[in-house]
Amino acid sequence: LDLHGMFKPSGLNVCYPNVLSFEGVRGLENCKWHNYDMPAYDVTMPFIRMAAGPVDYTPGAMNNASRYVFRPVTQQPMSMGTRVHQLASYVVFDSPLQMLCDSPTFYERNVDCTRFIASVPTVFDEYVPLQSKVGKYLSVAKRKGDEWFVGALTNWDKRTITIDFSFLPAGTYKATVFTDGINADRNATDYRKTEITVTSDMVLKYDMASGGGVAMRIQKL
């Protein structure tokens, strides 16, 4: 069960493990009718609401808008912030039953993004909090088996975030990295995909656009 239109979890899923997720959150659907500050909410909610249990935020918007372009439109809704902000949400937000909020044809057109979303597990074996500040930005690394995923989000302030890869065990890894594109402040759908080799002794810096993020999948070589 995924309980939508529901208050935050309070132990029901402990007694009934078939209850996989709860709404109880100002989810992405609110962008259809209001201009709440969603990027700021996205870097606040995980520290508060998500502490109570899984959250069905329904991420995955492919129609993305910068701060000064966004408008609440019911017929053709858009998300606040960048495309990579949406991708990173799948790593950051915990929900054993995840959703794709947008039109199926959007995912067919955006194959790289769709493949990344499909690769992110819905449950993990290990969580490692990284550089974060409530209401400002956050980053987290999560492990499933031998694979790691990193998600980072920022509010409307563009910033550079540092990812310390010391959470990785010894060895060499391939990281598939999605970062905000050079034009993401104006065209929020703009992103850059790269593949790099990383080890546990590396520390890398990534620029996040206004309402942006970083998303990566790390596989052992």
Outline where the language-model segments fall:
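Conserved, mostly hydrophobic/aromatic
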Residues: 1, 92, 150, 211
